[in-house]
């Protein structure tokens, strides 16, 4: 299963680990398919660490709270798998505020982040040179003291290449 995140800085094709983390994959793919991530900003970019996105472009509580939401409305549990680690550039992982607080936000690593193993659900990885080149462009964006990009970095839209959830 793969999707392409069409961003303001280029395309990022990602493989989603549907069999290893089915609930996280279902949430991510359903949000992709519904257009939820369209225009979603990368609101945190930390060079040598990660870029975070997944909050709605236009928060509209309570349907779209500022921090985002899952397809089930509330938070959902982690799917920590020992074999899935933050061991490379281009790992996709759920952002959270602690155990069982996953919603819509996720991040893509710029480097290894082993301190997140066991804390955040890894659910995919960047595939292909184009996506890695796009990550390099995103990592080079100037940020303020709070790691917010000084120029817009966002997901424009998403293409799902094969959706096992579609009948």
UniProtKB/Swiss-Prot annotation:
Residues 1-160 form the PPIase cyclophilin-type domain. One of its GO terms (biological process) is protein folding. InterPro entries: Cyclophilin-like_dom_sf (IPR029000), Cyclophilin-type_PPIase (IPR024936), Cyclophilin-type_PPIase_CS (IPR020892), Cyclophilin-type_PPIase_dom (IPR002130), Cyclophilin_A-like (IPR044666). Keywords: Isomerase, Rotamase. GO terms for cellular component: catalytic step 2 spliceosome. It catalyses: [protein]-peptidylproline (omega=180) = [protein]-peptidylproline (omega=0). The keyword NAD does not apply. Its EC number is 5.2.1.8. GO terms for molecular function: peptidyl-prolyl cis-trans isomerase activity. It is an enzyme of class 5 (isomerase). It holds the Pfam family Pro_isomerase. PPIases accelerate the folding of proteins. It catalyzes the cis-trans isomerization of proline imidic peptide bonds in oligopeptides. PANTHER family: PEPTIDYL-PROLYL CIS-TRANS ISOMERASE-LIKE 3, PEPTIDYL-PROLYL CIS-TRANS ISOMERASE-RELATED. Belongs to the cyclophilin-type PPIase family. PPIL3 subfamily. This is Peptidyl-prolyl cis-trans isomerase-like 3. It comes from Gibberella zeae (strain ATCC MYA-4620 / CBS 123657 / FGSC 9075 / NRRL 31084 / PH-1).
């Amino acid at each position: 299963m793969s999707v392409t995140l069409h961003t303001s800085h280029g395309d990022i094709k990602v493989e989603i680990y549907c069999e290893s983390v089915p609930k996280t994959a279902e949430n991510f793919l359903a949000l992709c398919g519904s257009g939820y991530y369209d225009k979603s900003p990368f609101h945190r970019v930390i060079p040598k660490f990660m870029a975070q996105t997944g909050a709605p472009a236009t928060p509209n509580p309570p349907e779209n709270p500022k921090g985002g939401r899952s397809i089930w409305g509330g938070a959902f549990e982690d799917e920590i798998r020992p074999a899935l680690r933050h061991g490379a550039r281009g790992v996709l992982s759920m952002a959270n505020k602690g155990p069982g607080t996953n919603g819509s936000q996720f991040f893509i690593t710029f480097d290894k982040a082993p301190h997140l193993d066991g804390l955040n659900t890894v659910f995919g990885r960047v595939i292909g040179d184009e996506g890695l080149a796009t990550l390099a462009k995103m990592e080079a964006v100037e940020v303020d003291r709070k790691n917010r990009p000084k120029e817009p970095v966002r997901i424009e839209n998403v293409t799902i290449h094969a959706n096992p959830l579609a009948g």
